[in-house]
Amino acid sequence: MTWNEGYVLEVNYTYGFYGELSPLKLALANTLKSLKSPNLEKNFNYCELACGRGYSTNLLASCYPQAQFYANDFNPSHIVEARTLAETAGTKNVHFFDDSFEEFINQDLPQFDFIVLHGIYSWITPRNRQAIVNFIRQKIKVGGMVYISYNTLPGWAAARPMQALMLRYGRNSSEPILSRIEKALDFTEQMLESKANYFTQNPILKPRLEKLKEQNRYYLAHEYFNEEWNAFYFDEVAKELEEAKLNFMGSAHLIDYVDAVNLSSAAQTQLSQVTDPTFREVVRDFFLNTQFRRDIFVRGKLALLPQEHLQALGNLRFALVVPIKSIKLKQQFPLGEVELQEKVYRPICEALENGPLTLGELQKDSKTKGITLNSLYQALIIMTGIGYTHPAVNETVRKQRQKSTDAFNSAVKTKSLYSDEMAFLASPLVGTGIAVNRLEQLLLLAKERKQDGPQFVWQVLSSQGKKIIKEGKTLETEAENLEHLKNVAENFNGDRLPLLTKLGIS
């Protein structure tokens, strides 16, 4: 097999950012499970395996300038882009390597507090999975955390053959991969319309195919068109990672910690009767029909004493990361649609609107008077899982990190003059990426340059032959585009800009 071992190299992966990779988010999960976490205000070492274009690693390195970040990807084009972004931002604490997993282990690397890998485990050969296990065994510290996400059974059971169909269709063509993807999607849709038994007997595939047609083609190239493509039962992954002396700690997807919104009473009862913890996770995946897991494994667990755990929970600091008016109490969970209690969630949001608070401070806040500690705790876990809140640092630490995140954000915003690929900016307050689209980034640039926002954005777009598309219709005239941009700027200045300022982004 060639050096790329069946992995798609014809087009680069997307500039994605994955919030589960944030050290603060991973440490929160550890605390919820009553385990001691690395001290994130001191030096620590962090490694991302298969970092793609390095966007997540670069962003996180800017949020934690006291730490050292390392990452590999065997696609040289990805590493060139990752290093270029780091150089442009002046980020000195991040190191990228265009090594395979087998080669990377031979570099002069430290022992790591965190090793993370997003999705790649499903797209590589058994030999490369073994190389990852070997790397983790040698390079993770005792007490270190490993984040691994992967396609999961039984959730992929129905759709897995559809991926195989599209991959095989693409094999029969020598056209560029993006063209093969379009034709494979069309061919699959024709089979659905022709009522092939596979589709008629698996009705969940129709909406899934519709969703695929809407997705970024560069993402589909890597998600659906690798020669190696696997979905795993949880126990299969856990067994492979045992060789690296890893034990399952819990999920990085925080909603998983609240059974009340995931499982019926009957399911919870049956699950509680499963005594083997590994098999219990497998059974849980059957109840939820899980198709993607976000797991945290640890090499050795240091449990907190009950009083230590209570103190750690009380010291957890949270910040709102969305405008308060955008928060919806009606939410869709695995168990179905749930209306979150307004008398609990609304006061918490109002208290956090003024700035980050610890769980202990929230308990004493006048706005949350009468809400029990357990209700506060569960609400914050759910809101963080949804993406409304996020763990935060104190003001002193935020100020220490402001310079490095400003430099990273400046590099990204400058790129927005030419591209919409980079859609996250770094927040020193919450130590993670916040979604900020191209129009918003251009408005921030206009503000910095003391220029009229709508006019500045229109000059950039029109110089590139671009026009605003509103509700599926292209706005043709300059007046129409400027009018729309004025409305966008007004809404941005009223809601988003104050939030971004609090998050240390604007």
Swiss-Prot record:
Disulfide bonds: none annotated. CDD domains: AdoMet_MTases (cd02440). To R.prowazekii RP789, RP027 and RP028. This is Uncharacterized protein sll1526. Pfam families: Methyltransf_31 (PF13847), MethyTransf_Reg (PF10119).
